[in-house]
């Protein structure tokens, strides 16, 4: 399951570093590995692309669901995310500003539902909820 970091890199495929992400995704797909595009990661990336007026990157993002599995947020995901957030707060593990919606707990809830590993640039906070690994560590 893609976190917003790798997803953002996949949409900005023109930069040399980002070609690594494209090659990585292609290798996974060539070996029939299920790759998931969670709605919350789409939201995080999309809002920044809109602000920056990156229409080419938006087109790349829009094309991804034809290649990989798009995962909409469900009510059950939001309930699980609330549970994860509350448990984390009660045990003293910060998940960000309590007044803000936390995308990481929503992403974690989606990954839990699907039994997926999150491919990310930043394992930190996600690892307290679900299996999360650096994208480059997820190999065939």
Predicted segments with their positions:
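Active-site-proximal, substrate-binding regions of enzyme catalytic domains
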Residues: 40-88
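Conserved beta-strand segments of alpha/beta enzyme cores
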Residues: 34, 67-69, 131, 136
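Short, well-structured N-terminal submotif of metal-dependent ribonuclease cores
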Residues: 1-37, 47-63
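Active-site neighborhoods of divalent-metal-dependent phosphate/nucleic-acid chemistry enzymes
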Residues: 69-117
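Hydrophobic helix-cap positions at the C-terminus of alpha-helices
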Residues: 27-28, 64, 88, 129
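Acidic, PIN/NYN-like endoribonuclease modules and their adjacent C-terminal/linker elements
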Residues: 27, 108-140
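Alpha-helix capping/helix-boundary segments
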Residues: 6, 41, 77, 107, ...
């Amino acid at each position: 399951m893609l976190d917003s970091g790798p997803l953002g890199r996949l949409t900005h495929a023109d930069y040399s570093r980002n070609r690594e992400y494209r090659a990585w995704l292609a290798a996974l797909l060539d070996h029939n590995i299920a790759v998931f595009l969670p709605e919350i990661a789409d939201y995080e990336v999309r809002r920044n692309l809109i602000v920056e007026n990156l229409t080419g990157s938006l087109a790349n993002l829009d094309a991804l669901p034809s290649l990989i599995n798009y995962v909409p947020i469900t009510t059950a995901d939001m309930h699980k995310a609330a549970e994860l957030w509350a448990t984390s707060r009660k045990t003293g593990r910060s998940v960000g500003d309590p007044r803000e919606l936390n995308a990481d707990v929503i992403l974690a809830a989606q990954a839990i539902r699907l039994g997926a590993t999150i491919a990310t640039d930043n394992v930190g906070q996600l690892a307290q909820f679900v299996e999360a690994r650096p994208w480059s560590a997820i190999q065939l």
